[in-house]
């Protein structure tokens, strides 16, 4: 569990978010064969050491909301640049600058990140989106709909019911996209 830290000022939050977005954009443009995106959601203020270990070595981290505290984002930022959206439980002042939806390019693919997929309007595929990343349900899933990949890493925070505690990795490379759910406490996935 993270030790609570004082909330960041609004300007500092905005500066950190835009710096991470610039770093992500630079990495995407300069991407060599293979980019690994770490995907996490629903931490609810708890960043498990197993989640940190599962995300080690990724090129960028996506947090799909219900972060719980600015300290979670700060700890993840020490691993890799972050793309984050606000979840329905992210109501404190530290989360005010986080968007509800982010559409961005990473490693030559177009991502759309939203906490609750039900809040995503329209047809993502018609907008050129390759992958929709969401959270909220706490149920890890990888689903293909034609050329669109839907990825929910599940919850990496406090266990809910009998659902697994998990994160995901999205591998982007010349051979296409590959998503994997990483249950925490299970053996670490092989290196790319």
Model-derived segments and spans:
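N-terminal active-site segment of His-dependent metallophosphoesterases
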Residues: 2-82, 90-100, 108, 163-166, ...
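Active-site metal-binding loops of divalent metal-dependent hydrolases
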Residues: 41-45, 65-67, 88-90, 116-118, ...
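Generic structural signal for conserved hydrophobic packing positions in ordered secondary structure
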Residues: 42, 76, 104, 113-115, ...
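General structural signal for secondary-structure boundaries
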Residues: 69, 171, 185-186
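Conserved beta-sheet core of the metallophosphoesterase superfamily
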Residues: 83, 110-112, 117-180
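Short, structured secondary-structure boundary patches
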Residues: 86-87, 104, 153, 182
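Metallo-beta-lactamase
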Residues: 95-118, 186
